[in-house]
Amino acid sequence: MVKSHYICAGRLVRILRGPRQDRVGVIVDIVDANRVLVENPEDAKMWRHVQNLKNVEPLKYCVSVSRNCSAKALKDALASSKALEKYAKTRTAARVEAKKACAASTDFERYQLRVARRSRAHWARKVFDEKDAKTPVSWHKVALKKMQKKAAKMDSTEGAKRRMQKAIAARKAKK
Protein backbone atom coordinates (compact mmCIF):
# COMPACT_ATOMS: atom_id res chain seq x y z
CA MET A 1 0.00 0.00 0.00
CA VAL A 2 1.36 3.41 -0.97
CA LYS A 3 1.70 5.98 1.78
CA SER A 4 -0.57 8.91 1.01
CA HIS A 5 0.72 11.36 3.60
CA TYR A 6 0.64 14.47 1.44
CA ILE A 7 2.84 17.46 2.10
CA CYS A 8 0.70 20.28 3.48
CA ALA A 9 0.90 22.96 6.15
CA GLY A 10 0.42 21.28 9.52
CA ARG A 11 1.76 17.83 8.55
CA LEU A 12 4.15 16.31 11.10
CA VAL A 13 7.47 15.23 9.60
CA ARG A 14 10.52 13.37 10.89
CA ILE A 15 13.95 14.60 9.82
CA LEU A 16 15.96 11.76 8.24
CA ARG A 17 19.53 13.09 8.06
CA GLY A 18 21.72 15.86 9.40
CA PRO A 19 22.18 17.48 12.81
CA ARG A 20 18.43 17.28 13.55
CA GLN A 21 18.14 13.60 12.60
CA ASP A 22 15.10 11.76 14.05
CA ARG A 23 13.56 14.96 15.39
CA VAL A 24 9.89 15.69 14.71
CA GLY A 25 8.61 19.00 13.37
CA VAL A 26 5.56 20.50 11.71
CA ILE A 27 5.46 21.88 8.17
CA VAL A 28 4.67 25.57 8.58
CA ASP A 29 4.95 26.65 4.94
CA ILE A 30 5.83 25.22 1.54
CA VAL A 31 8.70 27.12 -0.09
CA ASP A 32 8.70 25.37 -3.47
CA ALA A 33 8.40 21.88 -4.94
CA ASN A 34 11.51 20.67 -3.10
CA ARG A 35 11.66 22.62 0.17
CA VAL A 36 9.44 23.29 3.19
CA LEU A 37 9.61 25.38 6.36
CA VAL A 38 9.66 23.14 9.43
CA GLU A 39 9.31 24.09 13.10
CA ASN A 40 8.59 22.51 16.47
CA PRO A 41 8.15 25.07 19.27
CA GLU A 42 8.46 22.35 21.95
CA ASP A 43 11.95 21.31 20.78
CA ALA A 44 14.75 23.85 21.28
CA LYS A 45 16.77 22.58 18.29
CA MET A 46 13.81 22.63 15.88
CA TRP A 47 13.47 26.34 15.26
CA ARG A 48 11.87 27.47 12.00
CA HIS A 49 14.16 26.43 9.18
CA VAL A 50 14.09 25.22 5.57
CA GLN A 51 14.28 21.48 4.97
CA ASN A 52 14.58 19.63 1.69
CA LEU A 53 11.70 17.22 1.03
CA LYS A 54 14.21 14.44 0.35
CA ASN A 55 15.31 14.85 3.96
CA VAL A 56 11.90 14.55 5.65
CA GLU A 57 9.48 11.68 6.18
CA PRO A 58 5.85 12.81 6.37
CA LEU A 59 4.00 11.20 9.27
CA LYS A 60 0.33 10.30 9.42
CA TYR A 61 -0.44 13.02 11.97
CA CYS A 62 -1.58 16.45 10.91
CA VAL A 63 -2.29 19.66 12.84
CA SER A 64 -4.78 22.24 11.61
CA VAL A 65 -2.76 25.44 11.18
CA SER A 66 -2.70 28.08 8.49
CA ARG A 67 0.32 28.57 6.28
CA ASN A 68 3.10 30.61 7.86
CA CYS A 69 1.38 30.73 11.25
CA SER A 70 3.08 32.12 14.34
CA ALA A 71 5.01 29.95 16.76
CA LYS A 72 2.38 30.61 19.45
CA ALA A 73 -0.47 29.45 17.18
CA LEU A 74 1.53 26.35 16.25
CA LYS A 75 2.22 25.58 19.92
CA ASP A 76 -1.50 25.92 20.76
CA ALA A 77 -2.50 23.69 17.84
CA LEU A 78 0.04 21.03 18.87
CA ALA A 79 -1.22 21.14 22.45
CA SER A 80 -4.88 20.85 21.44
CA SER A 81 -4.42 18.00 18.93
CA LYS A 82 -1.84 16.10 21.06
CA ALA A 83 -0.16 14.96 17.84
CA LEU A 84 3.30 14.74 19.42
CA GLU A 85 1.98 12.50 22.22
CA LYS A 86 0.27 10.28 19.64
CA TYR A 87 3.51 10.03 17.66
CA ALA A 88 5.47 9.19 20.82
CA LYS A 89 3.31 6.05 21.21
CA THR A 90 4.15 4.68 17.74
CA ARG A 91 6.64 1.91 16.97
CA THR A 92 8.81 4.28 14.97
CA ALA A 93 9.23 6.62 17.93
CA ALA A 94 10.06 3.68 20.20
CA ARG A 95 12.64 2.44 17.70
CA VAL A 96 14.24 5.90 17.49
CA GLU A 97 14.39 6.15 21.30
CA ALA A 98 15.93 2.67 21.54
CA LYS A 99 18.53 3.63 18.94
CA LYS A 100 19.40 6.78 20.91
CA ALA A 101 19.63 4.81 24.16
CA CYS A 102 21.88 2.22 22.52
CA ALA A 103 24.14 4.95 21.12
CA ALA A 104 24.36 6.65 24.53
CA SER A 105 25.05 3.43 26.46
CA THR A 106 28.44 2.83 28.04
CA ASP A 107 30.72 -0.12 27.43
CA PHE A 108 29.65 -1.74 30.70
CA GLU A 109 25.92 -1.36 29.83
CA ARG A 110 26.52 -3.04 26.47
CA TYR A 111 28.35 -5.85 28.30
CA GLN A 112 25.42 -6.26 30.73
CA LEU A 113 22.99 -6.42 27.80
CA ARG A 114 25.10 -9.07 26.07
CA VAL A 115 25.23 -11.20 29.24
CA ALA A 116 21.47 -10.83 29.77
CA ARG A 117 20.74 -11.91 26.17
CA ARG A 118 23.03 -14.92 26.53
CA SER A 119 21.38 -15.92 29.81
CA ARG A 120 17.88 -15.55 28.36
CA ALA A 121 18.80 -17.68 25.34
CA HIS A 122 20.31 -20.34 27.63
CA TRP A 123 17.20 -20.62 29.79
CA ALA A 124 14.86 -20.62 26.80
CA ARG A 125 16.89 -23.41 25.21
CA LYS A 126 16.95 -25.39 28.47
CA VAL A 127 13.16 -25.13 28.95
CA PHE A 128 12.53 -26.12 25.34
CA ASP A 129 14.89 -29.11 25.61
CA GLU A 130 13.16 -30.32 28.80
CA LYS A 131 9.72 -30.09 27.18
CA ASP A 132 11.05 -31.78 24.05
CA ALA A 133 12.42 -34.68 26.12
CA LYS A 134 8.96 -35.28 27.62
CA THR A 135 6.99 -34.96 24.39
CA PRO A 136 9.24 -34.91 21.33
CA VAL A 137 8.28 -32.44 18.64
CA SER A 138 8.86 -33.63 15.11
CA TRP A 139 8.84 -30.80 12.63
CA HIS A 140 8.00 -33.33 9.92
CA LYS A 141 4.75 -34.13 11.75
CA VAL A 142 3.93 -30.43 11.95
CA ALA A 143 4.55 -30.01 8.23
CA LEU A 144 2.48 -33.11 7.49
CA LYS A 145 -0.46 -31.79 9.50
CA LYS A 146 -0.28 -28.50 7.58
CA MET A 147 -0.27 -30.38 4.28
CA GLN A 148 -3.25 -32.48 5.38
CA LYS A 149 -5.15 -29.37 6.38
CA LYS A 150 -4.46 -27.77 2.99
CA ALA A 151 -5.39 -30.98 1.19
CA ALA A 152 -8.65 -31.20 3.13
CA LYS A 153 -9.53 -27.71 1.96
CA MET A 154 -8.48 -28.35 -1.62
CA ASP A 155 -9.86 -31.87 -2.11
CA SER A 156 -13.46 -32.09 -0.98
CA THR A 157 -14.60 -34.73 -3.50
CA GLU A 158 -15.34 -38.35 -2.54
CA GLY A 159 -12.39 -39.70 -4.55
CA ALA A 160 -10.03 -37.27 -2.85
CA LYS A 161 -11.34 -38.29 0.58
CA ARG A 162 -10.74 -41.95 -0.24
CA ARG A 163 -7.18 -41.20 -1.39
CA MET A 164 -6.52 -39.32 1.87
CA GLN A 165 -7.87 -42.18 3.98
CA LYS A 166 -5.76 -44.65 2.03
CA ALA A 167 -2.62 -42.55 2.57
CA ILE A 168 -3.34 -42.22 6.30
CA ALA A 169 -3.90 -45.98 6.59
CA ALA A 170 -0.64 -46.68 4.74
CA ARG A 171 1.25 -44.33 7.08
CA LYS A 172 -0.22 -46.05 10.16
CA ALA A 173 0.65 -49.48 8.75
CA LYS A 174 4.26 -48.32 8.26
CA LYS A 175 4.62 -47.58 11.98
Swiss-Prot record:
Residues 150-175 are annotated as: Disordered. One of its GO terms (cellular component) is cytosolic large ribosomal subunit. Component of the large ribosomal subunit. The ribosome is a large ribonucleoprotein complex responsible for the synthesis of proteins in the cell. One of its GO terms (biological process) is ribosomal large subunit biogenesis. GO terms for molecular function: RNA binding; structural constituent of ribosome. This is Large ribosomal subunit protein eL14. Residues 162-175 have a biased composition (Basic residues). Keywords: Ribonucleoprotein, Ribosomal protein. Pfam families: KOW, Ribosomal_L14e. Belongs to the eukaryotic ribosomal protein eL14 family. Residues 152-161 have a biased composition (Basic and acidic residues). It comes from Leishmania donovani. It comes from the Eukaryota.
